Amino acid sequence: VDPNRRVLTDYSIVIANDKITALGPSHELENLYRDATTVIDAAGKVVLPGFVSAHNHVGYAVFRGRAEDVGYAPTHRLYLPMSGVITNSEREVIGALAVTELLRGGVTTILEMEEDAELFAPFIESSGIRAFIGVMVNDVNLDALASGQTVFDDTVRTQQLSQAIGLAERWHGRSGGRIQAVMAANGLSMSSPALLKGLRAAADDLGLRVSIHLGFGERELVESVHHRAQFDYATDCGMLGTDVIAVHCYDVDETEIDMLAKSGTSLAHCPHMNQFRGEVAPIQAMQSKGMQIGLGIDNYFSDYFEVLRSCIASARIRAHDPEVLSAQDALALGTIDAAAVMGLDHEIGSIEIGKKADLQIIDMRRLGLTPTNDPVATLVYHGHGKDVETVIVDGQVVVSNGRVQTADEDALITQASQAATAAWDRFSQRYGSFVAPAPN
């Protein structure tokens, strides 16, 4: 996915330490590098840049198979109730499984934002994945929120900002820069002006990006709580700008798209999750205004190929045009464009000399991928995460022969299954079902 979107045939890649140092015809490089320490035979295979997911909540994998039919982000009926019954150890192992799945499926970079993101940071680092990590702050009183009221709490705000800044100070730049921090907020309706302005100040002081859910169906709530239109409030609090990653933005009008574009705000587009909520973001209109857009997985899912297909399908449905957004376009959104959203396009997102060696290798000689008339189109429309054979991050092989090398997959599957079962048992005992009642 270089600037010319070339598909190179019978080429080899040379990696030294964490970078791509040579790229050229195989017959030339094989002669020049006969003494290479490690050789990966990719004959009959396709090498792609690793996928970049600009938005993740790995701990939310506990809701897989529970939340997809509950509608919009089910904060009151699932998220808040579950937070009161699940243990840290259960969340930790479920999050570890989600990270492992992402790596296994060719995802080499994520942006993980969650209320207790530091819980997942040690495993994220040891897994070998590249990541931005941030505490997803809000300062509402949760007891009041559970009853349908929005009340901001000064004590909560102080604690949340301290936690977010603390994570950044402890984790930013770890593992040679593979782990970075991000300042993150849940959304506008759950965040006071003081919280968001404090987050903005912290991001400026630490030189970090900001990520926040915007334009995702809280328009009326924001106006009710803050007495401001959603993007006016975002502007007031410093939540639009060249270092801001807005997430979702499916509920935006033309004026709001102009505000996003003129401010230089980037978009983490999560089409697969949006579809399950019956929503489609107007990315063609955003791109026409010059917005930088990249893809994100979001929470319950892990197969990035499904995200690519959802991106294409949703764009074509919205445009009523079967030729909008090609396979090449979608692949770019999931690699170099998503890297640009995170400010990493100078380092990752394409296979070019001097860039980080973040790669995935897929064997095309298998059912579902044959015949391969066009490797990009075949993979985008027919590939799956389970087809990925090898994954390299920072020059290190983290997946080999379809198995993650940095974690015990079998143990994680068992432990995460047990953790989820225990958490849902407590949930159903408390609420009488697997979905809590809506607040009055």
Locate predicted features.
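Active-site microenvironment of metallo-dependent hydrolases
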Residues: V1-Y11, A16-T21, S26, L32, ...
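Alpha-helical scaffold segments that flank or form the walls of functional sites
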Residues: R64-I129, Q160-G176, S417-A419
